[in-house]
């Protein structure tokens, strides 16, 4: 983790860091190229995507950034038919409220004031609680960060060397980090796992700089992707999920973002991993052992009949505790 040594003002390192950032900005491509989606035949199964966003009365301390309620159980059913999607279809079909939508507002088992359950088989929100209300996504943001990175990875540098300035800022902001150190050079794969499993803001900002030159330019790519996916009530200003009044979504649209994220094999693998060890570096000769903030909490408390295939937790004081997850019935 980060230690107090980052409080020491290191003039030369800051100058080097700024010079490196300037070079990265100069190299930044003129414009983000959208990746064409290859839509293939998929087995049609009912997917449950649940968003939890704890109310202000349930907020935890800043030390519990990724804590979340684990008492929502999604009951659904599986279908064995297959469907063929034509390549002309949009990358994401905007979900509608199901005719038999179940309002969970009076469900005392669900502590969260916000929830959405999306059946990706028919693009319907089948249950929820203020499912179209504005919420702050906190680190659920990193699902969109992962999407944008994965679709720009061929145009990015393949490694990043961490500098003093960024790590020091994140330390002061008390952001959750993967634990990469000043001078450490890390590849894209390790950064992706560092982004998702421990919810590393260090990895998020590194990937943003690699893909776009800065957090601000990366946020533009995030918003372009939202527009491409047809999202109406989602906007991003940073890749980490740190609170910003202009960074928001809804439970329904966050579920749709997760649906899209899981369409890609690489993203699905990262979002569905419990533990991962980064490659050896001079700073970490044995690598860093990363553990999923989601899987570590649901381990031993799994909902019967449901297999969680991936997910991402979040926490800020303003957002409360939150979770987006993707599950299939395993009957």
Stretches with model-predicted labels:
Residues 38-52:
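Hydrophobic membrane-insertion alpha-helices, especially the h-region
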Residues 1-35:
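N-terminal Lys/Arg-rich, disordered targeting/topogenic segments
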Residues 71-77, 85-252, 261-265, 329:
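Active-site-adjacent loops and short helices of periplasmic peptidoglycan-processing enzymes
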Residues 51-69:
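Sec-dependent signal peptide cleavage junction
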Residues 231-232, 243-248, 252-331:
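Domain-terminus/edge residues, biased toward the C-terminal soluble/receptor-binding domains
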């Amino acid at each position: 983790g980060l230690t107090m040594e980052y409080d020491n003002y290191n003039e030369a390192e800051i100058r080097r860091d700024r010079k490196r950032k300037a070079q990265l900005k100069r190299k930044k491509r003129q414009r983000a190229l959208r990746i064409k989606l290859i839509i293939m035949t998929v087995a049609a199964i009912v997917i449950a995507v649940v968003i939890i966003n704890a109310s202000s009365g349930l907020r935890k301390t800043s030390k519990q950034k990724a804590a979340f309620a684990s008492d929502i159980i999604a009951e659904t059913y599986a279908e064995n038919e297959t469907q063929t999607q034509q390549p002309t279809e949009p990358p994401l079909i905007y979900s509608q409220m199901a005719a038999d939508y179940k309002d969970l507002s009076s469900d005392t088992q669900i502590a969260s004031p916000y929830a959405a359950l999306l059946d990706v088989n028919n693009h319907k929100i089948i249950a929820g609680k203020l499912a179209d209300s504005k919420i702050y996504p906190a680190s659920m943001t990193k699902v969109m960060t992962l999407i944008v990175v994965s679709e720009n990875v061929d145009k990015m540098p393949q490694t990043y060397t961490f500098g003093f300035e960024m790590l020091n800022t994140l330390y002061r902001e008390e952001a959750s980090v993967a634990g990469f150190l000043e001078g450490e050079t890390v590849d894209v794969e390790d950064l992706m796992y560092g982004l998702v499993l421990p919810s590393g803001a260090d990895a998020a900002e590194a990937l943003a700089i690699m893909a776009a030159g800065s957090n601000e330019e990366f946020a533009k790519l995030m918003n372009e992707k939202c527009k491409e996916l047809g999202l109406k009530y989602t906007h991003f200003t940073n890749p980490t999920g740190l609170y910003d009044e202009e960074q928001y979504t809804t439970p329904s649209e966050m579920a749709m973002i997760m649906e899209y994220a899981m369409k890609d094999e690489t993203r699905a693998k990262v979002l569905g991993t419990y533990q991962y060890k980064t490659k050896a570096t001079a700073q970490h000769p044995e690598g860093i052992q990363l553990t999923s903030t989601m899987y570590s909490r649901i381990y031993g408390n799994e909902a019967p009949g449901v297999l969680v295939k991936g997910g991402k937790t979040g926490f800020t004081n303003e957002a409360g505790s939150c979770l987006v997850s993707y599950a299939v019935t395993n009957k």
